[in-house]
Amino acid sequence: MAKSKFERVKPHVNVGTIGHVDHGKTTLTAAITTILTKKFGGEAKSYDQIDSAPEERARGITINTSHVEYETDKRHYAHVDCPGHADYVKNMITGAAQMDGAILVVSAADGPMPQTREHILLARQVGVPYIIVFMNKADMVDDAELLELVEMEIRELLSNYDFPGDDTPIIIGSALKALEGDKSDIGEAAILKLAEALDSYIPEPERAIDGAFIMPVEDVFSISGRGTVVTGRVERGIVKVGDEIEIVGLKPTIKTVCTGVEMFRKLLDQGQAGDNVGILLRGTKREEVERGQVLAKPGSILPHTKFTAEIYVLSKEEGGRHTPFFAGYRPQFYFRTTDVTGSIELPAGVEMVMPGDNISVTVNLIAPIAMDEGLRFAIREGGRTVGAGVVAKVIE
C-alpha cells in the first residue's frame, strides 16, 4: 500500500525585500527561491518571473507586487517583491502585504542610497517590526575595509530610525553569484545564512486568534424579545458567550455583555478571528451601536481623534486628485467600515502635497475612532478614494 505524503505544517511568516532601486532585491528574491527549493522543495522562480509583477488592488489603489513562497528548516515564508519604488511605498502604506519582517538589500558597492533611507523610514512608520540586511554585490568590492564602512553606515542608519542597528543581522553576499551556483561564502552559503537569520531573528508572529478580541461593526439589528444583534467579521481574538465587551468609537464607550454568537443562523458558544458572526448584546439598544464602531475586549483599544500618519496620495493616472492639496485639507478618512471627516496638518516647511506623493501628516478627526498604531485607512472625497494611510502614532 502506498504511503501518504507526510505534510509538516510549519509556522507561516510574511517577509519582503526592500531597498534602493538596482541594489538587487529581485535578484536576491530569485536566489532565495532557487537555493531553498534545492534544499527544502518548493518552486524556484526566475528573475523574469518575479520581475513581471502582476497588478493587484488594495484600498482602491493599483500596486504591482510579486509573491513568492519558500521553506526553510523551521518555517514557511511568503515573500513580496515590488518592481518599482512607488509600488513599495503603496504596498507598505496600504498594508496590502503585511510584513512580519523585511530584508533590506543594500549594494556593497554603493552603500545606503536615498531609497534605502526612505524604505527604512517607511518600515518604521508602518510598523514593520524587524529588519535583516543583505549586503549584496560583495563580488564587486575587493576591499574588506570598504565592506566594513558600508556595514557601519547601514547600522547607523537603522539606529537613526529606532531599529537596533548594532544587533541587526547583516549578511554579506552576492545574489547573482548564488543564482549562478557559486559555492563560496558569498554565493549559496550567504543565502543559507540569510535563511537562518530569518528563522532566528524574526520571532514567530502572533496569530490573529491569539490577540485581544476586536470586531468592526458592519450592521446592527434589533430582534424582538432577544435584543440587539451586531454583525461583522471578527478581526482578532475570540469572543465567548458571557464575555464582557466594550463598544468603542464615535460615541462614549459603553460596556455590555455578549449573550449569544450566531453564524449561518446557528448558535455557537464562541466566534473567532476570521468568522462572520452576529453577536447578541445584553441590554444594549439598537441606537447605541452603529457601523464604524468596534466591539472589543474591555480596555484593549481606545478611541482617538488625533494622530500622525504616513499617507500616499493617488496620482491623477490612478484616479486620484488632479490638483495638490494644502494644510487644512478636509477629506473623509475611511476606517474599517465607515468614513469620518478630518483635517490634515502638514509638516513644517511643506506648503502643499502633490498627487503621487507620500508624506507624514497629522490628522484631526471630528469624531473618535478606535485605533492602534498600524491601523490602515483610505482617504476619500465624496466616496472616491484619493489616498491611503497608516496610523504611525496616536496623539490624543
Swiss-Prot record:
Question: Known InterPro entries for this protein?
Answer: EF-Tu_GTP-bd, EF-Tu_GTPase, EFTu-like_2, EFTU_2, G_TR_CS, P-loop_NTPase, Small_GTP-bd, T_Tr_GTP-bd_dom
Q: Which domain of life is it from?
A: Bacteria
Q: Where Mg(2+) is bound, by residue?
A: T26
Which GO molecular-function terms appear in the entry?
GTP binding; GTPase activity; guanosine tetraphosphate binding; translation elongation factor activity
Q: Does the keyword Transport apply?
A: no
Catalytic function, reaction form: GTP + H2O = GDP + phosphate + H(+)
Q: Which major enzyme category is it?
A: hydrolase
- Family that this chain belongs to: Belongs to the TRAFAC class translation factor GTPase superfamily. Classic translation factor GTPase family. EF-Tu/EF-1A subfamily.
- Could you identify this protein by its name? Elongation factor Tu
| Organism annotation | Nitrosomonas europaea (strain ATCC 19718 / CIP 103999 / KCTC 2705 / NBRC 14298)
